[in-house]
Amino acid sequence: MNIATKLMASLVASVVLTACSGGGSSGSSSKPNSELTPKVDMSAPKAEQPKKEEVPQADNSKAEEPKEMAPQVDSPKAEEPKNMAPQMGNPKLNDPQVMAPKMDNPQKDAPKGEELSKDKSNAEILKELGVKDINSGIINNADVVLNLKIDEKDHITVVLDKGKINRNHLKVTNTISAQDIKTLKDSSGKLLGYYGYMQLNQVRQDENYSDEKVSLNEYYLLSMNDADKIRPTKSISYKGDMFYSYKDVGNQKLKASVEASYDDVTKKVSMKVFGENNDYWKLGEFGRTNLLENQVTGAKVGEDGTIINGTLYSKIDNFPLKLTPDANFSGGIFGKNGEVLAGSAISEKWQGVIGATATTKEDKK
């Protein structure tokens, strides 16, 4: 405390001396100034010592603050990469998930899949077509199981799964007495379908009653793949056959020649059928009245290749220039380029199936 009092007294004295020397010469005033300056300088460090002692205390608090901040800064930095890692990982994981369906899509392309499904053997196609009658569809007689068989030359035959069946006291014998099946193929050789007829005999013997039943059934067969039906984009001529029979004749198979043509301008198909015993038919649109032959001009072909409202008109006895509605005709045009015509005719008196193909190589292209 004495030192501080002395310092304060010396400071006051220096101030008084400076004030008293204010009116003197400039030279006298410079001396006390020069003398007082070191005194002030000497006192300054002494006075600053306690301040320096407080400084480290302030420094200690400041030093502690960054130590506290360091973990605070480190923690968000450590958390940020942790947060970013899954964020960066998610898009990487999502990318293959998005790409996966893109890679799968071409594999599941409908057109390609359909093309591959169409690349079947004729035997596989024939199995899908089945044995179909124009009246009843799939033949489903009791104790009869029928299959189709195709050989190396694409000849088709109907075969029985079991010719003989023994069940308790009942004995069944099935036989195919006659058949004639023709294949219908496009220009590439792919099987489109078949048409023909078959005669099936069945004998049923019941031992309990000593009873025997014999039945003879005739079937006109036609089975085509509707997916191959098409309307041609140009005019085409066809030739083929019709298998037919009259219901009152009794299992007599007849055969007729067929001439047909499709007109790309009118979108109509015309057809003439020349049968046995001077039989003759001409294709026209549905009607119930007699028409002159030149009025029977064919039937329309729909966009999908279906022959619409077809009717076969036949000759009228004693009226050579007129035709009368005789049978309903249903069918269509098939194949890669519409090179196959097929259909069936059903009447109260007769029935038949028709198959015809393009006459020239140009028509098949």
From Swiss-Prot:
Domain of life assignment: Bacteria
Signal peptide: 1-19
Principal place of residence: membrane
The entry's keywords: Cell outer membrane, Lipoprotein, Membrane, Palmitate, Signal
Keyword Lipoprotein set for record: yes
Compartmental location: Cell outer membrane
Record-level GO cellular component terms: cell outer membrane
Region of interest (Disordered), residue spans: 19-121
Membrane topology: Lipid-anchor
Lipidation (N-palmitoyl cysteine): C20
Family annotation (InterPro entries): OMP/PagP_b-brl
Residues lipid-modified (S-diacylglycerol cysteine): C20
Compositionally biased intervals (Basic and acidic residues): 48-68, 105-121
Protein name according to UniProt: Outer membrane lipoprotein A
Annotated source species: Actinobacillus pleuropneumoniae
